[in-house]
Amino acid sequence: VRRSPSLLARLTGVVAGAVLAAAAVTAVAAPAQAATLTQVTNFGSNPGNLAMYAYRPDNLPAGAPAVVLLHGCTQNAAGYFANSGWQKFADQWKFALIVPQQSSANQPLSCFNWFVEQDITRGSGEALSIKQMVDHARNNYGTDASRVFVSGLSAGGGMSAVMLATYPDVFAAGSVVAGLPYRCSPPASTSTCQYSGVNRTPQEWGNLVRAAYPGHTGPRPRVAVWHGTSDSTVVPANATELRDQWTNVRGVSQTPTRTASLPANTALEVYGNDDVRVYRVSGMGHGTPVDPGPGAEQCGTAGAYLLDTICSAYHDAVFFGLNGGTGPNPTPTVSPTVSPTASPTASPTTSPTPAPTCVTASNYAHVTAGRAYHSGGYAYANGSNQRMGLYNTFYTSTLKQTGPNHWVIGC
């Protein structure tokens, strides 16, 4: 047992009234198939004393993405895996799921220790244990090291922010569901930001993330934030502070570049070039949004802290680029500038300039026809990489061809 009795005694008093997801989730039976959630042992030194579970869909190809799922307090790996909706899309789009499990030996309510110094520091504790699980999946399942993502609920959402901050070289993107910003509370105190929020400037929030791995020079992860407007367990102010933290980390404004209305009274705010998303679910309490049903964008099983509203797993999977897109945050294609080669002077042949090829169609049709591609739920024009809007049949764009496989918006 890693925790001293005195620390456990102090933590028990603090967290007793601060349950981040205070009811165990009952696992439902898995579909009749060979693939099952399986416990993995000996995945590393495991300094955080966590259990590892993994799910590999049938016929998982080499180089598949991987998503880490982090449950809430008093929940477990099997229950969150079975009910959160992620298994459906892992089967459909072929990516692995890594599901860490906390224990009461570490924390009385089986909460991930998103506020304990040794567990939120790069290279130690629970953060390192989770990173070792990712390494194990890469080495043993052949997952793609460049397409690793994380999503967590409540205390797991707080730990999701920890992983994004401490291991930006491991995670390409992540989502924080009913969670909290990285280092929003002093060590061993859950109540500071949980119940009232902590108001810091975006720069102050961003500095906390950058200090988690100061030697990192590569890109920082993209982040999606989910929160119910009626959440009284982790107050909604934390969603705004998360937005401030990660927009600053990504170097974009705290003013949204686009907003949209989604089902279940969900308001979506998009920041930068889809760097950060914030989903505010009107009237929803504390939990992971699910939407049980057979529809393409439905998922999950409703229950305690799994709230029947909208399928967050679907939207996160699309945001991560797991639905067949090119991956998050596509890098624009840059064509080198070529100096023309001088040739003997000749009388030019004059020919009429042809009218440009312009096509108006749904964004889905543009992608299907090869005039555009999709990534993170959005369509982008081939060649120019201009964002056209949501990738679906309802958004319509006009594209003009300006060169071989090069299209721009407008005509």
Say what each PLM segment does.
Residues 101-125, 187, 290:
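Cap/lid segment of the alpha/beta-hydrolase catalytic domain
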Residues 329, 341-411:
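Tryptophan-rich substrate-binding surfaces of secreted polymer-degrading and adhesive proteins
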Residues 60-108, 184:
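Short substrate-entry loop that stabilizes the transition state in hydrolases
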